[in-house]
């Protein structure tokens, strides 16, 4: 990870955020949850990365049993401003289903997510939790997943900078990645309205390893590109879930996306890839994604634009479009014209 200056501004800012970190959960008590007519089993875990404890969360239809046939594993990778469970297991009473974890657990997947260093329930540190550090976090987390599930290769979904983390991980640990879904992804960031605006703060990101995050900032995720593509209740529910975990988040991914792109070389990504872009997403142009897509060496690849969607395809009004294309990609039948490895 790149070392950041430890100037007074960063230290004083860190003192305001409090401890925030969660101790090792190892395997916290499991919980059976009833959602409508469907029940789900869930459990908390922790991964250890040196002195850093990384919070992990798992959800599936039923509790695992000894000797069962392992389910396909889907690992969900969060973005720059929010942690794992609020992003992927959000409850918005009276406004429909928003939990990507429950949706794919219902499809028969063993679904996991985590909080990266400095986010949510994971340890607070003086690091900036950049993309390279995220790869190390994913290594520690997948060690736990592989131990608990017996699966050696996992499906990954990453949204926004979560896609950059997942893509970078797929390059470093290709043997752990089965199929890879990258949503709200950016390659070079050229002509990106969001990143052009964000780059105005690049010196702040260099000088400070954390940035403030309040309710209005969380709301803006759903309004900055195209108002009306998400339910206002989602931003409020997300803020309610996220703000008790802290009023700041690391700056590392913002710095990488403002000054260090590209961080994922498509020529080095071996896994099958699905690129998903919301029609109005300001983080990357279609041409930027096409340039990435055409360089991918695996011909098992798809690029899909979802109409009526903005940056957050996970939590948009038309999120069921994401579920549809993602399920089809993850359950793609094996090819019959090539010999499969034994």
Where are these regions (language model features)?
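Conserved hydrolase catalytic core segment
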Residues: 157, 161-188
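Short, surface-exposed "cap/lid" segments of acyl-processing enzymes
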Residues: 65-70, 74-106
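N-terminal cap/lid segment of alpha/beta-hydrolase-fold proteins
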Residues: 35-66
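Catalytic histidine-centered segment of alpha/beta-hydrolase-like enzymes
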Residues: 309-319
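Conserved alpha/beta-hydrolase "acid-adjacent" motif
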Residues: 282-288
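N-terminal secretory signal peptides
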Residues: 1-12
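Alpha/beta-hydrolase
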Residues: 191-276
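Conserved acidic catalytic loop of the alpha/beta-hydrolase fold
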Residues: 136-153
């Amino acid at each position: 990870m790149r070392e950041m200056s430890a100037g007074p501004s960063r230290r004083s800012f860190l003192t305001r955020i409090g401890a925030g970190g969660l101790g090792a959960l190892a395997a916290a008590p499991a919980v059976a949850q009833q959602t409508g007519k469907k029940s789900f089993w869930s459990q908390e875990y922790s991964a250890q990365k040196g002195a850093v404890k990384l919070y992990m969360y798992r959800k599936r239809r039923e509790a695992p049993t000894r000797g069962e046939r392992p389910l396909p594993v889907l690992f969900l990778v969060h973005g720059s401003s929010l942690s794992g469970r609020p992003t992927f297991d959000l409850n918005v009473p009276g406004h429909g289903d928003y939990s990507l974890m429950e949706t794919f657990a219902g499809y028969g997947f063993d679904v996991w997510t985590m909080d990266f260093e400095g986010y949510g329930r994971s340890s607070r540190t003086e690091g900036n939790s950049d993309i390279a550090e995220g790869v190390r976090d994913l290594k520690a987390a997948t060690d736990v997943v592989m131990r608990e599930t017996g699966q050696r290769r996992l499906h990954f979904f990453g949204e926004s900078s979560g896609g950059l983390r997942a893509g970078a991980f797929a390059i470093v640990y290709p043997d752990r990645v089965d199929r890879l879904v990258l949503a709200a992804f950016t390659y070079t960031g050229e002509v990106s309205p969001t990143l052009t605006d964000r780059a105005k703060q690049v010196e702040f990101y260099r000088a400070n390893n954390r940035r403030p995050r309040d309710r209005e900032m969380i709301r803006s995720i759903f309004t900055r590109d195209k108002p009306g593509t998400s339910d206002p209740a989602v931003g409020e529910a997300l803020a309610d879930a996220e703000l008790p975990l802290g009023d700041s988040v690391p700056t590392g991914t913002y710095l990488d996306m403002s000054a260090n792109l590209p961080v994922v070389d498509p020529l080095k990504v071996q896994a099958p890839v699905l690129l998903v872009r919301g029609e109005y997403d300001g983080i990357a142009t279609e041409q930027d994604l096409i340039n990435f897509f055409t360089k991918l060496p695996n011909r098992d690849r798809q690029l899909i634009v979802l109409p009526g969607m903005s940056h957050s395809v996970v939590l948009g009004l038309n999120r069921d479009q994401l579920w549809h294309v993602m399920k089809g990609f993850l359950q793609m039948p094996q090819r019959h014209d090539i010999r499969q490895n034994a």
